[in-house]
Amino acid sequence: MARASNPRGTTAMWVRDYLDGLWDDRDFRPWYPRDGRPGLSPAQLAMVCVLQFLLNLSDRQAAEAVRCRIDFKYALALELDDPGFHHSVLTDFRDRLCKDDRADQLLSLSLERMRDAGVVTERGRQRTDSTQVLAAARDLSGLELVLEAIRAALEEAAQRAPDILDGLVDAEWATRYGRPVRLPSQPSHPATRLKQAGADARRLLERLPPHRRGPRAETLRQIVVQNFLLDARGGLRPRTAKDGQPKGAVRIVSPYDREARRAIRGNTRWSGYLIHVTETCDTDSPVNLITDIATTRPTRDTEALPGIHDRLSDRRLLPRQHLLDGGYLSVSLLHCSSRDHQVELVGPVKASGAWQSKERSGFTRDDFTIDFDQRQVTCPSGETSHIWLEPPAMAPYTVARFHPHQCDPCPDRPACTRGTAARTVNFLPRHLHELQARNRADQQDSQWRRLYATRSGVEGTICEFVNGHRARRSRYHGLSKTHVQHVLTGIAINIERLAQRTTRHPHRPRSPTTFQQYLDTRGLTWECWWRQGK
């Protein structure tokens, strides 16, 4: 009946037709106790979650689709009169996925089925990029943050032990914290209200002994520590810029999502997370599949790369070449990836931050000749360094210094250094220095540029995540639940791409425009691809 009503099939039907399902109930045995009561099939629930994110459905809509849509029943191998399940079951199943990296295990199992089907292989070419993810919480000012944290702690205390609040909460507290905080852009007396909020938070925490504090109360304690200091009289006062503020990597931005962090990249400011997406990009492959998804706090991209390679190694899907932008690369990662995983990283190493490199004038580090055997450096004017240091504070860099009597009379000093001291040259150990020089030389090669241009295709996948599946904003609170959302979305995109490959006509290149046809008739050449590496 499903085939009769959908002759061309749907994405949901494709999973059963070509893969006979992505998971089996035996794959989920470790997730459940042996003596539990019978429940719903975890393989079917996992498939429903994937279809939910494929079609951007809510939990209620997904449960209704299982009851009403015939292609869902076909994909799940259900009878036509199957009543389905309550929508809250999906919430419970996602909670199971949050534990012990089970979301990554779900992705690994699906990729294993796809590898058995021959649509993804090891030691190919892959590419990675990242984008911002907004937390499921509104941006709060400092005053709103403290007030909302107190409200959240009061709500938790009222649920756990309401007797603790007796004698503390009065009419004024009911006025201040009885409803969600909504302040205008310029609230009246903000400093006074912030000081009052700090005093209220302190009184509340004193009423809550440590052994009776829940997660919301602990969040309030951390917010108080991050935003207040003790004054000379033992009271709390708000922190100022002179006192110093906690770093963004540890500063809590919402009492309802303790793991979200505020970050700045260029002109972009957001509160939330980062998602790193890795996909295949082999030229002979008809479809690119997502092989890894990492959801992290908004830290540097270089910190995410080792974990990506470790997970790909566990899945036996390590690439031969890994295309990355400069944010992921460092010279040490180039060396470690080749040594530990035999993966060639293709991308530009970050340029030097010295003024000579930024202004493209003067003598850069590359203009100096480094003799590692003699442990000395020769400048463009022929002078040799007299000090060779390997300070632990600058590891793994080596420091070579010249003497003032060499630099002061030199006519090229303005092009060499702008400081009052003599020139100092910092460089990496020999094996890393040679690797860095090779990478910068490769960037001038047209063939290398043409290969690296393939990396830009992953930005289309990022766009598919953000615009096609609403991954820009998290549906849930917390890093683990946000990661579950991203993994299920990635599996859904893989299924969608494979279904389009097998149910549609083969891809044909775009026909030339009228003007391009005119150029062809006149025998004039034109660039087929604007990224030619020239």
Model region roles, listed by residue range:
Residues 61, 66, 82-83, 91-534:
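Anion-binding and metal-coordination hotspots
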Residues 30-42, 55-102, 106:
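Trp/Phe/Arg-rich N-terminal binding region typifying the photolyase-homology
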